[in-house]
From Swiss-Prot:
It comes from Chelativorans sp. (strain BNC1). The lineage of its organism: Bacteria, Pseudomonadati, Pseudomonadota, Alphaproteobacteria, Hyphomicrobiales. This is Small ribosomal subunit protein uS7. One of its GO terms (biological process) is translation. Belongs to the universal ribosomal protein uS7 family. Part of the 30S ribosomal subunit. Contacts proteins S9 and S11. It comes from the Bacteria.
Amino acid sequence: MSRRHRAEKREINPDPKFGDTVVTKFMNAIMFEGKKSVAERIVYGALDQVQEKTKQEPVAVFHQALDNVAPHVEVRSRRVGGATYQVPVDVRPERRQALAIRWLISAARGRNEKTMVERLSGELLDASSNRGTAVKKREDTHKMAEANRAFSHYRW
């Protein structure tokens, strides 16, 4: 299914409260079945809780959490001869952000606080201080890449 042209990037509007496009992307990733207002309530509620607990700017804590979760290298499968090698490759900036958002949300959903607002704020606080499930996921990804460094010459 090749395309004649590369699909152009869509313009993402900044969110109304903080004026940040990354917060909008995060909201869109949390959203189920097009329920944007529910996603907004969850994200803004979590950021308000973060502000109450840390007494810091919530968007700064959010960005710190994303930076701490975003992977620098990952492994990709590459077939050479009859063998499949896990080849470490650098992660593009857009993919870094997308993976960080995805991992933060899945880690928050896996927590066992009562509401999603509490789960998300807890995971954001953990990730901003280099703890939590999402940060562990990044560490595991980096370990895999380090373990397979011998195959880095198979890069493409």
